[in-house]
Structure formats: structure tokens, C-alpha cells
Amino acid sequence: MTRVPRGYIARRRRTKMRSFASNFRGAHLRLNRMITQQVKRAFVSSHRDRGRQKRDFRRLWITRINAATRIFKVFDSYSKLIHNLYKKKLILNRKMLAQVAVSNPNNLYTISKKIKIIN
């Protein structure tokens, strides 16, 4: 059987994969088969971790809000603060509350006091 040299289509496919693997090291950068395996693995990891990142940030925000509410002792816990926020129909998401809790805890204290006064 004669050798068939591959055309530009295969080369284009490999260079596309190579461009994804430009920051890899060693054989993961040089060998075509390793490049395809590692690029697939990287895409799987990035897809999985995009969902995980959302969960992790939400958990971090909840932890920060809970710590701030326990320090000021306005509400016993995070869950009571969130419950009262929903009851009063205040539109503050967890990300905003966590940012307030970290940057200026006194503002979180005043927000929670207002909620408690309205009760």
C-alpha cells in the first residue's frame, strides 16, 4: 500500500488542537495524540468546574453573611436574616450582602436593624 500524505484538512485540525494546547508542557505540547487527549480532558474539567464555581461562590457568600450576622448578633443566624429579607421583599442577593459584610460591616448592621424594626 502506498503512503497517502494527508492534506490541509488534517493539518488544520491538528494546528487548531495545538493552539488550545499552547500553554501545556512537555509531551502534552508536542505529540499530537497526547495533545488531543489533554485538550479533551481540559475541556471536561473546565465544563465541570464552571458549575462547581457557582456552587463554591454561593457557599462562600453564605459563610461571610453568616459570620457577619453572628458578630453583630442582630439575628441568630444567616437563615433568619434571609427569611426576614424575603418577608420584607427586599431585593438584595447573597453576593451583594457578602460584599457589604466584608467591605463595610456597619452597613449590614443597619440593614438588619431596619428589617428588625419593620417586624
Swiss-Prot record:
Recorded GO MF terms: rRNA binding; structural constituent of ribosome
PROSITE patterns the record matches: RIBOSOMAL_L20 (PS00937)
Pfam families from the UniProt entry: Ribosomal_L20
Compartments it resides in: Plastid, Chloroplast
Annotated keywords: Chloroplast, Plastid, Ribonucleoprotein, Ribosomal protein, RNA-binding, rRNA-binding
Organism this protein belongs to: Brachypodium distachyon
Role according to the record: Binds directly to 23S ribosomal RNA and is necessary for the in vitro assembly process of the 50S ribosomal subunit. It is not involved in the protein synthesizing functions of that subunit.
Gene coding for it: rpl20
Protein name: Large ribosomal subunit protein bL20c
Family: Belongs to the bacterial ribosomal protein bL20 family.
Primary localisation category: plastid
